[in-house]
Every structure is written in C-alpha cells, then in structure tokens.
A protein has these predicted regions:
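A structural signal for multi-pass alpha-helical bundles of membrane permease subunits
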Residues: 21-302
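Short, Lys/Arg-rich, polar N-terminal cytosolic tail immediately upstream
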Residues: 1-17
Length: 302
C-alpha cells in the first residue's frame, strides 16, 4: 500500500463516530416502535398471567388463563370458526382474483373502465360494506332472496341460519377483497417475459399448457403474497362480522376476534382477554411464517 493510500484511508475513530451517528438517526423511530408496539405487547403478556377483571384486584395465576382456554369449549369453537372463515375467505378470492386478472390482462373494448368498476368494492370501508350487506341479507326485504325468487329458488336465511352464517360472511369478503387479489396478480402478469410464450407457441403448445407450465409457475410468488395478505386480513376480521352477525346466531359465527372483544369489553375479563391475544398472535405469526417459507421455496424452485 502506498503512502498516499494510507493517508487517504479513513481513521478508525472517524468510522466509529460515523456509525454512532447512524444510530442517532434511527433512535427516534426505535423509540416510537418500542412505545407503540413492543411495550404494549410485553404488557399484554404480563396481564395474561393475572386473574384481572376491571374494577377488581389483580391476582397472579401464572399459566392458568392459558390452561383455561384449552378447556374452554366456546374458545375452541371460536378457533374452528376462525379457521373455517379464513380458509373460505382466502381460497375463493384467490381463485376468482386469478380468473379476473387473466381476463383483464387481455385486450378488449372498455377494459380500463370495467377494471376500474371491478376494483371499486375494495375502496369502501368494511363497516359501510357490512351495513349494505346486512340489508341485502334480510330474509323478507333483502335483495338476495328477491334475486333467488326470480330464478325459482327458495329463500335463504343467510346470516340468520347457523349453517349458512359463515358462508354468507365469506360472500361479503369475496365481494370486498377479490379486486385486491386481482390487482396483485395483474402486477405479476404485466412483468412476465414474452419470449417463453413465443417459443412455446412455435412448439404447438395450447393455451392451457401455456398457463399450466409458464404463467402459473411465474406468478406463483404473487399468488403467495396475495395469500399472505388475505390470510392475515381474514384472521383479523372483526368489523364486518360484528356489524352483520355479532357472532350469532348464538355463537355460530363467533370468531376469535369476537370472543376477544366480548371477554375484554363485555365481561371485562382483562387477564383472559390478554391470554387470547397472545395465543392469537402466535397463530397468526406461525401461519405468516409458513406462507413466507412456501413463497421462498417457490422462488428457489423457480
């Protein structure tokens, strides 16, 4: 190394001061994250170890709240309702969003206008959507039963039936969030190269073979991203369910979020509600990590 290179090299003390300045710039954001996310989370974990109802003295019970949840039939049913709702609210919009994206990816008259109309539902707030669909689900005056009568089908109780309440709520989710999946997949389709399609067509590949062996593998990462977003959103769904059914009839549509709300703000059982939050967080985190792992595997194999 020449003398000029040695003289031009930064001194260790200067580098240390420069690195410390980086931390100073990041420090305000870290303080906000700690105050808004980390501290409330740690406080929730701490509260879950107490038998604490608002207005009474808290008693330390350790893991009793968690063992109580494992034996609570209503909580276990809420978990099943949550997974049932989530499975339908993820799979169906993914399929319909993929089909819609494939349609709108092609050139046809008024494509831009129709695509804009198709994306309008996702712009509405969940509460507004829920209020509109509540009127549509009405057994006597709702428009859905009127449409069924036009084609000669018997009326349905929709959200007033324990059997059909969750599929009816999923229908709202499908209408509301399928456009989001379509936009994500459209972004993937727009980025696809044209060379593989041209080569495959020269070899005599059919449209189904083009989709099966070229399009689907290439847009798989985008579908997984859409699945992650929809899974987290469906697991967290509260406002739509609460406005339309309040968890009823009975507890037929009571998901973990509805159960949590009732424990915290109806029964004021803060300790039990905190334990539900911790369990639910672990469930969401595990599913998100699983889907992200599948996405990474899809990229590796691709």
């Amino acid at each position: 190394m020449t003398a000029s290179a040695i003289a031009a090299a930064p001194r260790p003390g200067f580098l240390a001061r420069r690195h410390r300045s980086y931390y100073l710039f990041v420090a305000p954001a870290l303080v906000v994250v700690g105050a808004v996310i980390i501290f409330p989370w740690l406080f929730t974990v701490w509260m879950s170890a107490f038998d604490w109802k608002i207005g009474s003295v808290a008693h330390f019970v350790g893991f009793d709240n968690y063992t109580g949840l494992a034996k609570n039939q209503r909580f276990l049913e809420a978990i099943l309702h949550t997974f049932y709702f989530t499975a339908l609210a993820v799979v169906v919009p993914l399929f319909l969003g993929l089909v819609a994206a494939l349609i709108f990816h092609r050139e046809f008259p008024f494509r831009g206008v129709l695509r804009g109309i198709f994306t309008m539902p996702m712009m509405a707030t969940p509460v507004a959507v829920a209020l509109v669909w509540t009127m549509m689900f009405h057994p006597q005056q709702g428009v859905l039963n009127y449409l069924l009568s036009l084609v000669g089908l018997p009326p349905s109780l929709w959200v007033y039936s324990p059997t059909w309440v969750i599929p009816s709520l999923v229908l709202v989710e499908i209408w509301h969030w399928t456009p989001l999946v379509m936009l994500i997949v459209l972004g993937g389709l727009a980025a696809l190269p044209t060379e593989p399609y041209e080569s495959a067509r020269l070899d005599g590949a059919t449209e189904w073979q083009l989709f099966r062996y070229i399009t689907l593998p290439l847009i798989a990462p985008f579908l997984i991203v859409a699945a992650v977003i929809r899974t987290i959103d469906a697991l967290k769904a509260f406002d739509t369910i609460y406005v339309i059914s309040q968890g009823g009839p009975g507890t037929a549509s009571e998901t973990i979020n509805i159960y949590l709300y009732l424990q915290a703000f109806a029964f004021y059982n803060v300790g039990n509600a905190s334990a539900v939050v911790v369990v639910f967080f672990v469930v969401i985190l595990a599913l998100a990590l699983l889907l992200l792992y599948v996405r990474q595997r899809a990229q590796w194999t691709g």
